[in-house]
C-alpha cells in the first residue's frame, strides 16, 4: 500500500516536472513597401528562434512572410503567432501603413493616382473617353471615304 502511494507521488512529481513554461521571445518583423502599378504593396517578414510562426494581415496568412496590397481604409494591424511545442503566443502589432504608403507612392501622388479613387468613377471615365474617341474616328473615316469617292467620280467626268 505504501509502495503505491510513493509510486503515485513520484508519478505526480515527474509529470509536474515535465510541463515547462515556454518563454516566448517576440519575433523580429520587417515591413517593406513598394509601388507597383499604382498600388502600395506591403511585405511583412518575421523571424524567430521558435519552431514555427504564422503572420496574419488582411485575411492573409503566411508562415514567415505575407504579401498584400494595402489601400486606405484597410486595417493597420497585423499579428504574429509563435509556436513552441504545443504552446503558442500571439503578438499584436500596429503599423502606420497609411503614412508609409503615402511616402512610397510619391510619384503616383504627383499624377493624382494615389490614393486610389472610386473604381467605378475611373472605369466610367475611361469607357466614356474610349467611346468618344471611337465615334470620332468612325465619323472621320466615313467623311474621308465619302469625299474621296466623290472627288474621284468628279475627276473621272472631267477626263476626255
UniProtKB/Swiss-Prot annotation:
The keyword Ribosomal protein does not apply. Its main location: host cell. Both disulfide bonds are absolutely critical for the interaction with MHC antigens. One of its GO terms (cellular component) is membrane. One of its GO terms (molecular function) is D-mannose binding. One of its GO terms (biological process) is symbiont-mediated suppression of host antigen processing and presentation of peptide antigen via MHC class I. Disulfide bonds join 29-46, 40-101. InterPro entries: Adenovirus_Gp19K, Adenovirus_Gp19K_sf. Binds and retains class I heavy chains in the endoplasmic reticulum during the early period of virus infection, thereby impairing their transport to the cell surface. Also delays the expression of class I alleles that it cannot affect by direct retention. Binds transporters associated with antigen processing (TAP) and acts as a tapasin inhibitor, preventing class I/TAP association. In consequence, infected cells are masked for immune recognition by cytotoxic T-lymphocytes. Belongs to the adenoviridae E19 family. This is Early E3 18.5 kDa glycoprotein. It comes from Human adenovirus C serotype 5.
